[in-house]
Amino acid sequence: MDPNCSCSTGSTCTCSSSCGCKDCKCTSCKKSCCSCCPVGCSKCAQGCVCKGASDKCTCCA
């Protein structure tokens, strides 16, 4: 899988722990592919596990 996890909207994806997840649009993305993702983030709020502060997040910029 692409390290940026740029799969199509609604598709499945297999994000790895090292996935930067800059374009996470996967409905099945429930792994720690986002280092941080605020609750209100439209791009990374698909069940990703947040592991950092929103100011360190690049996927929602």
From Swiss-Prot:
Binding residues for a divalent metal cation 7: 50, 57, 59-60
Annotated stretches, region: Alpha: 30-61
Modified residues (N-acetylmethionine): 1
Keywords: Acetylation, Metal-binding, Metal-thiolate cluster
Entry annotated with the keyword Acetylation: yes
Gene Ontology biological-process annotations: cellular response to cadmium ion; cellular response to copper ion; cellular response to zinc ion; detoxification of copper ion; intracellular zinc ion homeostasis; negative regulation of growth
Binding site for a divalent metal cation 6: 37, 41, 44, 60
Function: Metallothioneins have a high content of cysteine residues that bind various heavy metals; these proteins are transcriptionally regulated by both heavy metals and glucocorticoids.
Region (Beta) residue spans: 1-29
Endpoints of the signal sequence: none
Binding site for a divalent metal cation 2: 7, 13, 15, 26
Keyword field contains Transmembrane helix: no
A GO molecular function held by the record: zinc ion binding
Gene Ontology CC, one term: nucleus
Protein name per the record: Metallothionein-1
